[in-house]
Amino acid sequence: LKNLHNTKSPKIVGIASGLYPFLYNYYSNFTLVDSLAQLLFFIAFFLVIPIIINFLLKIFSKKITFAAKHYDLLLTFSNVVGFAALLTYSIIGPVKKIILLVMILMFGFSFLLKKHLNKVIILEYILALIVAIQLAVYVGNNINLSSGWKQLPDNISEVTFKKRPNVYIIQPDGYANANTLKSEPYHIDNSNFESFLIEKDFKIYPNFRSNYTNTITSNSSMFAMKHHYYKNPKGNTKEAYGLRKSIASNNVVVSVFNKNNYKTSLIIEFPYIIVNRPTLGYDYCSIPYKELSFLSRGFDMAVNSLDEMKKAIKENKNQANFYFIEKILPGHISVTKNQSKGKEEERK
């Protein structure tokens, strides 16, 4: 703690700028940022870059008169503006306009904090300590969640197909079943589409529904071919750890198709289910990791899933294929009252 009084130390000030936002980002979004590649990136983003900026300020203060005269103020700018910008990202993600607005506001506020930088830094470290404890408790409670629910009661994972048709799982997110669409809150006449499905020998399950509140919990159950109870009955708890890997990694469904020499393709329009960069079990994904920003929260880039589907079908027409096509938009209705826009707006 004695070193914290040295507010002109580039390392102390730089770490103070990013440590709490770094830990808060992991505490609030752990299931989105749990890969090693992301950890290394965020260490550089939250901690190394602020330290480098402060070292540069120190160098400039020795060579440039203006920087030397106003070094304390520049250091305050670096700390306060950096802390606010990084924390804003941790809370809302890469929303550039809001982050820029926060930086502008905190730039002005920094003039008032110039004489209190020592107290500001101590407060930032105290906040970091508090969230570090919260993060440790969360990780301790979740990192070792039992995967026993994924154990299958038989050897279906070793099945060998006698026929090899193309298989398509087409998932319009939140698309209600035939009976539900006709009633509240939807009141949608979907008879033309239902007639088309019947004409093409599709099987319609009128009252089919998911017991889960969102895409991740529902799909993790489907691809594990087992029911799980995470988030039940506590619907307001954080997303259970590891569920995304149950969808995008080598789950039992994908592994069965891989063992039967299928080409497996994950067609997604948003990187929502792969934002934490799990090791993919599919042969192909419509969003490669090299195009996925480390700052992404899953909805800040998009591809045309229909175009991707047409491309995949054309390229793979001479082999058996398994496709999981997830269409996020327009999304499911709100599942809690406080998030709902009201019956009429949700129906739209």
In which residue ranges do the predicted regions lie?
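Short, well-ordered helical secondary-structure segments
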Residues: 120, 157-159, 209, 312
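A long, amphipathic alpha-helix that forms part
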Residues: 146-162, 310, 340-348
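Feature captures the catalytic ectodomains and active-site-proximal regions of enzymes
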Residues: 29-37, 61, 331-333, 340-348
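Alpha-helical membrane-embedding segments
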Residues: 132-143, 153-161, 180-187
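Membrane-interface anchor segments at the N-terminal boundary of transmembrane helices
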Residues: 33-46, 293, 297-303, 347-348
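Active-site-proximal alpha/beta segments of enzymes that process anionic O-linked groups
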Residues: 49-113, 164-169, 174-341
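Transmembrane and membrane-interface helices of multi-pass
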Residues: 1-146
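Helix-boundary/low-complexity linker signature
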Residues: 7, 163-164
